[in-house]
């Protein structure tokens, strides 16, 4: 029988942070023995941002849970898109990007990937 894993909010796993962005995993290889998926909540404080980065081994899907900001992308981060609660973002493997919090409260993002362990460059 396949085992279902429920991760409680006080059991989340802090991951590698990217600049001011903090990620807490709820579904991961360590927590759930996941083999093809990963899910976390990422938070960015007011007037802060993540580092510029890309993922070499996975696609990402992001849902803006609360707050607002800019999502920079493109070869030189030349594309600026406003993001806010309810927006979805698809990030292909290898796509350079950087979320920035421009709002007056914490920017909260739900992040899902198609691999349990990401490689960030």
Task: Place the predicted regions along the sequence by residue.
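A short beta-strand-loop-beta hairpin characteristic of the jelly-roll/cupin
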Residues: 49, 58-85
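A short, N-terminal "cap"/entry segment at the start of jelly-roll beta-barrel domains
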Residues: 1-36, 51, 120-121
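Conserved hydrophobic/aromatic beta-strand scaffold that supports enzyme active sites
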Residues: 39-43, 61, 80, 88-90, ...
């Amino acid at each position: 029988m396949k085992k279902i894993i429920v991760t409680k909010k006080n059991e989340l796993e802090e991951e590698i942070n990217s600049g001011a962005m903090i990620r807490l995993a709820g579904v991961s290889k360590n927590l759930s023995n996941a083999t093809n998926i990963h899910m976390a909540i990422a938070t960015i404080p007011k007037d802060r941002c993540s580092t510029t980065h890309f993922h070499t081994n996975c696609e990402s899907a992001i849902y803006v849970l609360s707050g607002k900001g800019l999502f920079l992308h493109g070869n030189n981060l030349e594309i600026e898109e406003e993001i806010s609660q309810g927006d979805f973002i698809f990030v292909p493997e290898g796509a350079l990007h950087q979320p920035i919090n421009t709002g007056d409260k914490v920017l909260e993002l739900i992040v899902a990937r198609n691999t349990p362990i990401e490689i960030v460059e």
